[in-house]
UniProtKB/Swiss-Prot annotation:
Species classification: Bacteria, Pseudomonadati, Pseudomonadota, Gammaproteobacteria, Enterobacterales
Protein name: Urease accessory protein UreG
Family annotation (InterPro entries): CobW/HypB/UreG_nucleotide-bd, P-loop_NTPase, UreG
GO cellular component, one term: cytoplasm
Alphabetical UniProt keywords: Chaperone, Cytoplasm, GTP-binding, Nickel insertion, Nucleotide-binding
Organism: Enterobacter sp. (strain 638)
UniProt subunit comment: Homodimer. UreD, UreF and UreG form a complex that acts as a GTP-hydrolysis-dependent molecular chaperone, activating the urease apoprotein by helping to assemble the nickel containing metallocenter of UreC. The UreE protein probably delivers the nickel.
Annotated positions binding GTP: G14, P15, V16, G17, S18, G19, K20, T21
């Protein structure tokens, strides 16, 4: 029997460039004084996201582990999550008292989902720059994730996207499932995500 605490595992997915790594940096910096955190990043051929988070000082370097998937990023979080599961276990054993581990997927499409063996909760990140039509395109990330983030609201005027249309379509596609707009440059929407993690992840129990 494992003699370490089993942390909450939160999968963070979304297309390339949507802001997954920026979200993790913001969440880590906002939560690290209150909770014991770690991060597993996924990249196909490099450990670029691990490097970005480390250089940004999101957490201590040994709390951030990069996984090189060497293939489809979807496979590494769904069909064969063994490398990620091993990384989660290694971090859990190393620190013993982790409250939460974020698992960031490599950039993927709207159909990407996390194996329930790997993630207890899932956050899916899209961004306004992809166009206001993205929420109504659906896909498991949009409709089934535990929390949806629509990032880069500050870009809406520059790409001709209506936040009102995106809000309407998102509410229609998600029903009662929670979501928020974010502008991570200034921290807009971050507290709502943290509140969700604390509530649904039972971090404060």
């Amino acid at each position: 029997m494992a003699d370490y605490k089993h942390p909450l595992r939160v999968g963070v997915g979304g297309p390339v460039g949507s802001g997954k790594t920026a979200l993790l940096e913001a969440l880590c910096k906002a939560m690290r004084d209150q909770y014991q955190l770690a991060v597993v990043t996924n990249d196909i051929y490099t450990k670029e996201d691990q490097r970005i988070l480390t250089e940004a000082g999101a957490l201590e370097p040994d709390r951030i582990v990069g996984v090189e998937t060497g293939g489809c990023p979807h496979t590494a979080i769904r069909e064969d999550a063994s490398m990620n599961l091993a990384a989660v276990e290694t971090l859990s054993e190393k620190f013993g008292n982790l409250d939460l581990i974020f698992v960031e997927s490599g950039g993927d499409n709207l159909s990407a989902t996390f194996s329930p063996e790997l993630a207890d909760l899932t956050i899916y990140v899209i961004d306004v720059a992809e166009g206001e039509k993205i929420p109504r395109k659906g896909g498991p990330g949009i409709t089934k994730s535990d929390f949806l983030v629509i990032n880069k609201t500050d870009l809406a005027p520059y790409v001709g996207a209506s936040l009102e249309v995106m809000e309407r379509d998102t509410n229609r596609m998600r029903g009662e499932r929670p979501w928020t707009f974010t502008n991570l440059k200034v921290g807009d929407g971050l507290n709502k995500i943290i509140g969700f993690l604390e509530d649904k992840g039972m971090l404060k129990v």
